[in-house]
Amino acid sequence: MSASDPLLTQDQLALVEGLDALCSRHIDDKLLFDLDQQARYPFDVMQALSDGGWASMAVPESHGGAGASARDMAVVLEELSRHSLVVGQAYFSMWILGAEAVIRLGTNSQANEWLPRIATEGARVAFALTEPGSGSDAAALTTRAEKRGSDYVVTGQKVFTTGAAVADVIITAVRTSRGGTKHAGISTLMIDPQLQGVDIRKIPKMGLKGIDLCEVFFDDVVVPETCLLGELDAGWAGVLPGLAIERLYLAAISVGAMRDVLDLCLEHASTRETFGKALGSHQMIAEKLVEMRVAIETSRALVKQAAEMVDRGDGEAVNLASIAKLHATRSYVSATREAVQIFGGYGFTDEYPVSRHYRDCKYLEIGGGASEIQKIVIARSMGLRP
């Protein structure tokens, strides 16, 4: 195991050791191959994590959880993703994002219902924001929710909703009023995917096949007003804090996945011989491995900095999370490209996991705000944009 974190606290080290033991029992190369080839959600691994109490990490102690800090959650996601990017992404998308939204926006009744369900049952919560006509301009959403009596009637379409096909509830950003800027009049609803008028369709994709990206169609879906999450017309301000958390944790996931790539390359470079010596002893190959190690260390440092600021509640956390995501995700993409080069023709075959990393990595550079969006956020923080 290369590039482990030398600055872990004793509590964090215990988290890493516990996850390593669980993942070593439940995740192997065959499972990862099957999840990819069959486009199958890792139900068994996620159930094992839930049974072991790991779903409770992002839930406050007051609601049956562990109340983990952002620093600890970043450590958990790095370790999970070192074993399996799909499992790390599922853990983040289905448990952390949902818990964060309910903690921040939910009523007492909603918190009392959903937070214990996440903590003890591993309830799966999807988050639907992006629409076909908005893309990176996520605030330009058109899915609308009209108030009729004591209900909302929802009409519209979402796209690239992670895990919607397996979710117990879908937190959905909707437009509840017009007027003012596009950032105003936005609310969030907790929508039961089993309601009449909800249609979920999986989107075929090139990578990260073990967790679905979905289109979600809402055709006059009647949603009780008690499912309003947060204040009515809270606007983009109700959505934005969740995006900062998403960017931080996607960076942590990228660090873990990069560590797996480096481990695979180190093993291959030390066992394969070319021109009468180990592959890794060739200067050009060694240089690639060194660059991977440097990328891991710098990315992790940025993650730690951003996580510290999140825990402090510092307003600069949003910008630092964007910096961490920009650097870590593009470093992961670069590492996988070099990994395929190191493996040569073998890296181009499905038999070797670096090819899976090559297909998976691009999602992290796009999801949670593309790299170009992160640059805009960072430029704005530097006073370069209005």
Regions found by a protein language model. Name each.
Residues 121-129:
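A short, Trp-centered hydrophobic/proline-enriched beta-strand micro-motif
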Residues 137-155, 349-353:
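Cytochrome P450 C-terminal beta-domain/meander region
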Residues 140-142, 194-224:
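Flexible, small-/acidic-enriched active-site or ligand-binding loops
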Residues 68-69, 137-139, 163-168, 182-185, ...:
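Short glycine/proline-enriched turns and hinge-like loops at secondary-structure junctions
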